[in-house]
A protein has these predicted regions:
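Glycine-rich oxoanion-binding loops at beta->alpha junctions
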Residues: 64-68, 72
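Short, hydrophobic alpha-helical segments
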Residues: 209-220
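N-terminal phosphate/diphosphate-binding loop that engages ATP/GTP or pyrophosphate donors
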Residues: 4-52
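Flexible beta-alpha connector loops of hexameric P-loop NTPases
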Residues: 54-64, 120-121
């Protein structure tokens, strides 16, 4: 899992027992040499976590964090050492900066799955990402795997998501219900899967993982 730290509680905290791990940009800014183990941590259920990080507020380009993280992962042999079954790049819905679209280029990612709610700004951002994927199609970059509806319980939410997907000749591959267990797990510095493994929310996440694996041609390997 490679994430962009733009909030106070990056995903690595929840996947690594509540411990904040150094971001790649923080390590780079120190100007000192560092090892793979300094930037990567193995968290819950064997998930390897890396936080790209962001610039000092008001300075620099946030997309640079993604580029730096990808460069350092390759340079330090992360993929060879950990040999992950799946690599997930969790990036912002902002494709104005080329850095944020980096994982879908140059062979880093095979499929792009776009998470949206039925809120207008979320749909707008999702459409922009889908357009970026379309623009990259002729270059052989990652293809659009589908949309994931992260429900906010707004009016006509399912219809809006379905219409968005249809506009890009795609589909909504999963609908995730809004759940208070997410914030409860966050307070515990855990993921829902770790804190509430038998919950409906956890079951929806498992079903989503199975669907993504199927769409990526991994279904027969489970």
């Amino acid at each position: 899992m490679t994430g962009v730290q733009t909030c106070a509680l990056p995903i690595s905290i929840f996947l690594h027992g509540g411990e904040r791990i150094p971001t790649v940009l923080d390590l780079v800014r120190k100007g000192e040499s560092f090892d793979l183990e300094d930037m990567a941590r193995v968290g819950y259920n064997g998930v390897v976590c890396v936080e790209a990080g962001g610039p000092v507020p008001g300075l620099g380009c946030a997309g640079r964090g993604i580029i730096a993280a990808l460069e350092e992962l390759e340079k330090k042999g992360a993929y060879e050492k950990y040999q992950p079954d799946v690599v997930i790049y969790d990036v912002l819905g902002d494709v104005v900066c080329g850095g944020f679209s980096m994982p879908m280029r140059k062979g880093y990612a095979d499929k792009v799955f776009i998470i949206t709610s039925g809120e207008s700004m979320s749909v707008y951002a999702a459409a922009n990402i889908a357009m970026a994927v379309e623009n990259f199609k002729s270059r052989g970059y990652a293809s659009l795997g589908g949309f994931i509806l992260n429900k906010r319980n707004v009016k006509n939410e399912e219809e809006k998501a379905a219409e968005l997907a249809a506009d890009f000749h795609s589909s909504v591959i999963a609908e995730i219900d809004r759940s208070d267990l997410v914030s409860e797990a966050e307070d515990m510095r855990k993921t829902v899967m770790e804190a509430f493994p038998d919950s409906t929310a956890a079951e929806q996440y498992r079903a989503l993982a199975d669907k993504i694996a199927e769409l990526c041609g991994m279904g027969e390997e489970k």
